[in-house]
């Protein structure tokens, strides 16, 4: 039995009173649940199923009575199962093809039968699960079917039913009954070909539970009942259902007197068999009428005899599948509908499928219904509550990537699915994992298409049912007792689950030993799927599988040695064994068979030296992870020798520290470790092998002490040794084993005492006369003072209640002081580390150490020595750490401050001042410290802004900052400005008075006022007076005059008049002009600029011949450009007279130098000035009418008397510009006309093109429009390609009223994927913006070719709303600002007067022209390419 989650939250009680709408709503809610939640819960339940009975088809056991357990475990047949044989080929080519359509889709392409072969399984599922199904041909039955067709004209097989016997129906009305014994003999041949000629082919078969009766349904509608014991015909039923329809299904229920049949009319009938006074009768009752929806699949719930008392069986449930929904009804005690479940949209050609099976959910056995159509399988659990009501719970979805034509339960965990291309898929139901895929095209499966089309009665069935029948094979597949039988046109095949041994052996036969071991291990761990044949509890099952795995491992080892390549490079052999040997090691260790691994397997693999080496290397990861202990001495010795021979000494060291080396030669291992510098391994061997902890220290000290005492630099190797020594000492003093693990508890005190005694030795064992006292502590202090003291500090943490340890602690401290204080070999940093260590120890509340205070005074004098400037920062940092560690209590604070100030230890001063809350003095510390002086700003800001300081403290800091403001500004002006803006905003004028240096004041004001400096200051909150801003502007004029204009553009809060006076004072004429323009005095600003221009021109005029890059000429050009820009900025706001007052003086100023004689002006400057004058003319042409310009030039006294030679170039340039603009306008107009012509041609081609529908059937009713016979219905084709009957479209309410006319909208486009789009389209249509694209036309058979009205209707082409919509889209596509502006320009009515160039009209200059529009953009692009 199996456990599954019972989803109470989606459970729905379904009863007869429940309306179909409520049922649909409840199941739609259930369908929204994610399938993944079910998968996850099933995976959890899978691991709880431990017990599997070998009589089961892999149904896990639960805590229920044995009788309930056996219900799901026993096979249905009582007879001994027949022996299956391997598939063989039959010589059946002589059979004539029959008129009935019973051949499979795949059989038509099968070709020569001798080429049929079984399809290979998918590699992934095969390697993971092996071959799950056994696929065999029933030779005896297949041969007799072929023989019957040949000798007695039985016809081709059409249906099969299996119980204790196998019944096969034929196309000529015979029912062949075969035994399920080894011989597969023909027991009975029921019926005759004459009756078959009258009734037609057998279309359905059913055998009752005790295998005593057989029901046969025929293609022409008759039903017969046979006694399988005697072969007698008991009943011939001809009036059970309406005539003219074939029997599609006939099913016995658990009640032998009750059967259900389903005909090709879609109706379902209940058949009740009675025997009154020796007369056998049959009463028929219609359960479901085909007029309400055609049922094409029925499945009654069958229960085994052991489940006869199940509360569900008394209802005699029947599941029916129509083309639109699923129904579950109860036949007893009275007819009642328990559930309806609609399908939803799906492929109309897919086959509805139903299948029942009893499963165990939460220790209760209940029936589960699987139903599917297409590629989704739904599972419904049916159960009864205490009140007697039936509840149906949606369990899960099974989403597939193929369409199903058959669904079969093989047991409660495993299902077998057949898809539309005749591939079998074995699925684990709980995890939805596909275990195997098998192709069965060689079966040549029989299909029931002819019966669904009811060809024997004239084909009077609906097209929908006929379409489903194309793939129907209900009667060709039958399951019984965990076996599935497949009926082919000339054979019968059977499939069943392989036992676990067969699956493993199947892989072994295919030489897949690795996969076989992996599969066997999954059986061992209980993670395999579809397991058959394992019995007993978990330990018994594991033992059985383990024995089989050991056999495979021996075979695997022999194969590894035999398959070894005899020749070739050694790398080839190594690769071979690296692929094979790790598998043996892995599975031996997984099975916890070290005895097998290190005896038989090792001995076997040792025959080959390469295999032996690979074997030893495979042990390494298990040893390093401590998963392999207890290695035999021989293997351990071989392992070390192997790695040593391969020069892998680091690996040897890593292995030794994880091994039990007591069985090895200790001295030999130590010698090897020392020679190869394996210090960790050496220490481990001493500790574990000899319980010796001091000898490793002595060996390491002998190496690192001499160079340290000599003052030499240690090598990298010696540094590594020193670090290992420190860690080793730390571990010993902490009770930890080195390099891993713990020292045995009984040895911890002894080891600590030994290590302390060793460290405090006065002299070493082999001391020389020159050796200083306490050599070991001295060596460690020289090696790494800080780390050695850290080791001691960690050790002292444990010295709380141990009196002897406390004595050791004091003794070591005294030795440290004696060694370091009385010796000058140590640096200040090292001495400081010692006293910091001591200060921390003395500061502890439970301190027991005693240190003379005068030693701290000596250290203070040493660190603050003013005579020694070396290592200043180091000395200061050491003293600071000492104070922070609690050493301050050892000093007199006033003396400490004096010495710190004298030594310029400003961080020490800050530390002391902060303790006394003298924050203002800390500012001096920052300002005097060159390394930290810029941090003073953040410090002042934090004191003044962060809460926690008193008002007096803040005031003292504020005043101190104010006193040093000039120093702060000189240090960092922008930071000082930000500080002032934040904390001194009300005292800015005081700050300015304190800044006597004008350069500093300028930098400060620029940082404060110029937003471009990047400081984050809110100018509104500052409330700076205009006087300060003007003071800054004046300083700016002095120190950086070139930046005045740019600064004025971003500055605020200054007075124009006063600022103008400042700029005039410093003769900054451009700035003055800018301010006058800002003031509104345009003429005044212009006069200043004009005066500057004239002065520049005068300089050029009086200069001699110069180079082309004359700076004076460049000044003229720059000044002229600025003057032009001034005129252009302000001309829009001036009248014509005021514009002329600006532009004409500028023009005269530029032309004045040209009036002089040519000898007065260098030729080079003459050409340059003419070019600049032309630039002025081009600029003023946008604001001054061209006739006015010419008139002003001609009125000049110089040119008015006929001297036009000097200005000939200017006039010709103006005319060239006019010609260019006129040509540009004509070209643009031509391009637009061509573009418009092309667009209209393209539009005309688009709207007159015919529509090509995507399909030839209505997208709503799915019927071809040519076959519809009801009425002369119109066909509507949309531009999207969808086609509809107008009647279908009208039923879907896809019409919109628009200006009194009915307009259509495409149903699929507006509602299928675009929710709410139809309503939006309706509103758009009513507003006249869009129109649905459609073409109405009548079918050809509804209209006469010579209909004059049709010709008249097409004589006048008129744009319909669809074409208007297309035209609007085209206009929007090619719409642009420049083209619209140009079209507007061209569309204006022009009189001959206004259109004449150089007309004398002054009142309407070309200000409205597109050429005067600054936003006008001409976009010239080729037309887009379209497909024809």
Curated annotation (Swiss-Prot):
Gene Ontology cellular-component annotations: CORVET complex; early endosome; HOPS complex; late endosome
Name recorded for this polypeptide: Vacuolar protein sorting-associated protein 8 homolog
PANTHER family noted in UniProt: VACUOLAR PROTEIN SORTING VPS41, VACUOLAR PROTEIN SORTING-ASSOCIATED PROTEIN 8 HOMOLOG
Record bears the keyword Cell membrane: no
InterPro entries in the record: Quino_amine_DH_bsu, Vps41/Vps8, Vps8_central_dom, WD40/YVTN_repeat-like_dom_sf, WD40_repeat_dom_sf, WD40_rpt, Znf_RING, Znf_RING/FYVE/PHD
Main location: other
UniProt region (Disordered), positions on chain: 1330-1356
GO BP field: endosomal vesicle fusion; protein targeting to vacuole; regulation of SNARE complex assembly
Zn finger (RING-type) location: 1258-1310
Pfam families attached to this UniProt entry: Beta-prop_VPS8 (PF23410), TPR_Vps41 (PF23556), TPR_Vps8 (PF12816), zf_RING_Vps8 (PF23412)
Extent of the WD repeats: 195-236
Keyword Phosphoprotein: yes
Lineage: Eukaryota, Metazoa, Chordata, Craniata, Vertebrata
Modified residues (Phosphoserine): 26, 32, 127
Subcellular location: Early endosome
Single annotated GO MF: zinc ion binding
Name of the gene this protein is made from: VPS8
Cited PROSITE patterns: WD_REPEATS_2, WD_REPEATS_REGION, ZF_RING_2
Keyword tags: Endosome, Metal-binding, Phosphoprotein, Protein transport, Transport, WD repeat, Zinc, Zinc-finger
Complex formation: Interacts with RAB5C. Interacts with TGFBRAP1. Component of the putative class C core vacuole/endosome tethering (CORVET) complex; the core of which composed of the class C Vps proteins VPS11, VPS16, VPS18 and VPS33A, is associated with VPS8 and TGFBRAP1.
């Amino acid at each position: 039995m199996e456990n599954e989650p019972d989803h109470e939250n989606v459970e729905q009680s379904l009863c007869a009173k429940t309306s179909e709408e409520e049922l649909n709503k409840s199941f739609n809610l259930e369908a929204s649940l994610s399938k993944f939640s079910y998968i996850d819960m099933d995976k959890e339940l899978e691991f709880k199923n431990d017990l599997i009975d070998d009589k089961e088809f892999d149904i896990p056991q639960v805590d229920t009575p044995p009788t309930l357990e056996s219900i799901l475990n026993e096979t249905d047949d009582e007879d001994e199962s027949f022996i299956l044989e391997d598939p063989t080929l039959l010589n059946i080519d002589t059979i004539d093809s029959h008129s009935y359509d019973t051949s499979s889709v795949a059989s038509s392409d099968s070709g020569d039968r001798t080429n049929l072969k079984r399809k290979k399984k998918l590699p992934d599922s095969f390697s993971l699960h092996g071959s799950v199904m056994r696929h065999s041909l029933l030779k005896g039955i297949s041969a007799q079917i072929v023989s019957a067709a040949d000798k007695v004209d039985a016809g081709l097989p059409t249906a099969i039913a299996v119980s204790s016997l196998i019944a096969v129906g034929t196309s000529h009305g015979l029912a062949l009954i075969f035994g399920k014994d080894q011989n597969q003999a023909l027991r009975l041949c029921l019926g005759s070909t004459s009756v078959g000629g009258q009734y037609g082919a057998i279309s359905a078969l059913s055998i009752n539970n005790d295998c005593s009766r057989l029901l046969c349904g025929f293609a022409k509608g008759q039903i017969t009942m046979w006694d399988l014991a005697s072969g007698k015909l008991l009943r011939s039923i001809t009036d059970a259902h309406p005539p003219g329809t074939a029997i599609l299904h006939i099913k016995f229920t658990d009640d032998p007197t009750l059967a259900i049949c389903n005909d090709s009319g879609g109706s379902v009938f209940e058949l009740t068999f009675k025997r009154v006074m020796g007369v056998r009768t049959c009463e028929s009752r219609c359960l479901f009428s085909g007029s309400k929806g055609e049922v094409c699949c029925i499945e009654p719930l069958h229960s085994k005899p052991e489940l006869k008392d199940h509360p569900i069986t008394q209802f005699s449930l029947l599941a029916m599948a129509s083309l639109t929904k699923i129904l579950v009804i109860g036949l007893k005690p009275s007819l009642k509908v328990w559930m309806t479940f609609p399908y939803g949209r799906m492929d109309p050609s897919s086959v509805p499928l139903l299948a029942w099976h009893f499963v165990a959910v939460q220790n209760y056995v209940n029936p589960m219904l699987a139903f599917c159509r297409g590629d989704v399988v739904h599972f419904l659990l049916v159960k009864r509550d205490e009140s007697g009501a039936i509840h149906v719970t949606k369990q899960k979805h099974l989403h597939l990537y193929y369409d199903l034509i058959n669904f079969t339960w093989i047991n409660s965990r495993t299902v077998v699915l057949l898809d539309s291309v005749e591939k079998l898929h074995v699925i684990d139901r709980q995890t939805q994992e596909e275990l195997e895929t098998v192709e069965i095209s060689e079966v040549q499966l029989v299909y029931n298409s002819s019966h669904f089309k009811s060809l024997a009665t004239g084909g009077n069935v609906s097209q929908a049912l006929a379409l489903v029948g194309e793939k129907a094979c209900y009667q060709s597949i039958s399951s019984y007792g965990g076996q599935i039988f497949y009926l082919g046109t000339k054979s019968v095949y059977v499939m069943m689950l392989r036992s676990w041994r067969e699956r493993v052996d199947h892989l072994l036969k295919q030489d897949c030993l690795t996969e076989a071991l992996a599969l066997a291990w999954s059986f061992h761990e209980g993670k395999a799927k579809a397991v058959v044949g394992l019995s007993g509890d978990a330990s018994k099952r594991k033992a059985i599988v383990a024995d089989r795995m050991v056999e495979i491992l021996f075979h695997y080892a022999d194969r590894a040695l035999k398959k070894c390549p005899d020749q070739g490079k050694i790398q080839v052999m190594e690769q071979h064994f690296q692929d094979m040997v790790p598998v043996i090691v892995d599975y031996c260790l997984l099975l916890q068979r070290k005895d097998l691994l290190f005896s038989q397997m090792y001995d076997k693999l040792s025959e080959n030296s390469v295999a032996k080496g690979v074997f030893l290397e495979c042990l390494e990861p298990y040893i390093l992870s401590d998963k392999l202990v207890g290695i035999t001495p021989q293997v351990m010795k071989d392992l070390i020798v192997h790695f040593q021979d391969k020069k892998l000494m680091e690996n040897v060291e890593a292995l030794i520290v994880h091994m039990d080396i007591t069985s090895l030669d200790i001295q030999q291992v130590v010698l090897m470790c020392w020679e190869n510098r394996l210090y960790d391994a050496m220490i481990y061997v001493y500790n574990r092998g000899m319980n010796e902890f001091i000898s490793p220290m002595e060996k390491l000290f002998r190496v690192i002490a001499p160079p340290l005492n000599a003052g030499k630099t240690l090598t990298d190797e010696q540094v590594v040794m020193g670090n290992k020594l420190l860690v080793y000492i730390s571990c010993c003093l902490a009770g930890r084993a080195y390099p891993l693990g713990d020292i045995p508890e009984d040895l911890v005190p002894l080891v600590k005492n030994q290590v302390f005694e060793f460290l405090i030795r006065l002299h070493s064992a082999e001391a020389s006369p020159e050796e200083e006292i306490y050599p070991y502590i001295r060596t460690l202090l020289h090696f790494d003072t800080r780390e050695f003291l850290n080791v001691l500090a960690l050790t002292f943490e444990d010295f709380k209640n141990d009196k002897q340890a406390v004595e050791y602690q004091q003794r070591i401290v005294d030795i440290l002081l004696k060694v370091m204080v009385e010796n000058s070999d140590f640096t200040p940093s090292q001495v400081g580390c010692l006293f910091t260590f001591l200060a921390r120890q003395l500061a502890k509340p439970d301190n027991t150490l005693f240190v003379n205070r005068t030693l701290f005074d000596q250290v203070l004098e040493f660190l603050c020595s003013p005579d020694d400037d070396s290592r200043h920062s180091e000395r200061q940092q050491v003293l600071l750490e000492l104070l922070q560690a609690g050493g301050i209590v050892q000093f007199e604070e006033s003396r400490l401050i004096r010495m710190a100030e004298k030594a310029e230890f400003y961080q020490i001063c800050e530390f002391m001042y902060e303790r006394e809350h003298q924050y203002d003095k800390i500012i001096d510390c920052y300002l005097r410290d060159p390394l930290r002086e810029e941090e003073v700003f953040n410090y002042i800001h934090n004191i003044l802004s962060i809460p926690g300081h008193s008002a007096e403290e803040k005031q003292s800091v504020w005043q101190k900052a104010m006193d040093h403001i000039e120093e702060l500004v000189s240090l960092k002006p922008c930071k000082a400005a930000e500080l002032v803006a934040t904390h001194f905003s009300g005292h800015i004028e005081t700050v300015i008075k304190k800044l006597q240096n004008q350069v500093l004041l300028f930098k400060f004001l620029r940082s404060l006022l110029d937003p471009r400096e990047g400081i984050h200051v809110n100018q509104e909150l500052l409330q700076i007076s205009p006087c300060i801003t003007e003071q800054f502007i004046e300083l700016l004029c002095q120190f950086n005059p070139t930046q005045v204009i740019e600064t004025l553009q971003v500055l605020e809060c200054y007075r124009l008049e006063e600022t103008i006076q400042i700029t005039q004072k410093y003769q900054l004429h451009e700035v003055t002009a800018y301010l006058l323009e800002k003031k509104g005095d345009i003429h005044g600003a212009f006069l200043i600029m004009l005066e500057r221009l004239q002065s520049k021109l005068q300089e050029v005029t009086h200069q001699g011949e110069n180079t082309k890059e004359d700076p004076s000429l460049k000044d003229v050009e720059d000044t002229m450009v600025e003057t032009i820009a001034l005129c252009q900025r302000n001309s829009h706001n001036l009248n014509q007279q005021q514009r002329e007052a600006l532009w004409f003086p500028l023009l005269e100023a530029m032309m004045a130098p040209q009036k002089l004689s040519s000898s007065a002006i260098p030729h080079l400057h003459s050409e340059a000035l003419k070019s600049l004058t032309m630039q002025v003319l081009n600029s003023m042409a946008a604001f001054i009418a061209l006739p006015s310009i010419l008139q002003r030039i001609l009125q000049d006294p110089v040119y008015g008397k006929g001297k036009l030679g000097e200005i000939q170039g200017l006039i010709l340039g103006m005319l060239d510009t006019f010609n260019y603009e006129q040509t540009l306008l004509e070209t643009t107009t031509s391009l637009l006309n061509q573009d418009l012509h092309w667009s209209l041609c393209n539009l005309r081609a688009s709207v007159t093109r015919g529509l090509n529908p995507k399909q030839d059937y209505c997208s709503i009713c799915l019927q071809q429009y040519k076959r519809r016979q009801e009425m002369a219905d119109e066909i509507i084709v949309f531009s999207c390609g969808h086609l509809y009957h107008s009647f279908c479209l009208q039923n879907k309410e896809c019409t919109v009223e628009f200006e009194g006319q009915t307009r259509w909208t495409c149903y699929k486009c507006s509602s299928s994927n675009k929710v709410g789009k139809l309503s939006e389209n309706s509103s758009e249509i009513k507003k006249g913006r869009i129109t649905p694209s459609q073409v109405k036309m009548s079918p050809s058979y509804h209209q006469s070719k010579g209909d004059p009205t049709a010709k008249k209707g097409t004589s006048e082409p008129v744009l319909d709303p669809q074409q208007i919509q297309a035209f609007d889209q085209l206009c929007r596509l090619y719409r642009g600002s420049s083209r619209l502006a140009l079209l507007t320009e061209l569309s204006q009515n022009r009189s001959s007067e206004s259109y004449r160039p150089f007309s004398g009209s002054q009142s309407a200059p070309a200000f409205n022209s597109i050429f005067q529009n600054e936003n006008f953009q001409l976009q010239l692009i080729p037309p887009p390419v379209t497909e024809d």
